[in-house]
């Protein structure tokens, strides 16, 4: 990856954003396999061409700093911390991962995260759950009796004022959540991972434009909506999934009402995919807007 410095930030800041990481053929990390196959492969293929500005990597730097501090802490006799490991997935492919802490006494694998308070407010934990489940499966594969995943998240935008005013808002700037995984969940995770590597294997032979499309979930897709609006009012009276339903509502309400189309979007593609410049779907998205 090419790190730019549009704000002319001090060299130590840019150095912190720069990584000498190089992709290893046929080795995919847990975070990579949980992305869309298209995104994961495009990132690898175009790593030497992808540009990112140091100023846009501030939270990645913050996350790395947190991990570095916690890495130097003392674990107990039953705990392992900051361990890189890999599992053979067949045909020369490997699944790799780094867990932050594993407690052998409880079978719990813990990962430290930085996140927004709103992630907690909205209960958007599926990605965390999937990641720790993958770690549990991997630890099982190398002989540990792992059975629980846990996230300890530092909430970078936490507000004491909001915490005092709203009991549903996270009450502390650190949030802890965990999941006890059943034998069935762990087994199904292994089946999914093996299937994922089969997808990757097939996709690696395809040119960029023929790579399988990321799913709507992987693209963070929001569908088109049709808003019923009223003259003199800025917010929608009601939102509909189809233009026909919205039009029926307008006909019932009368002359002062009208339909406004609100196009859907793939926000991951638009704002959070580092390989978007090499993706035909992204190019189509921005061309449609233009």
Q: What kind of feature is each model-predicted range?
A:
Residues 4-5, 138-290:
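Metal-dependent nuclease catalytic regions and adjoining charged, substrate-binding loops involved
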Residues 1-109, 116-129, 140, 153, ...:
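Metal-dependent nuclease catalytic cores that hydrolyze phosphodiester bonds in DNA/RNA
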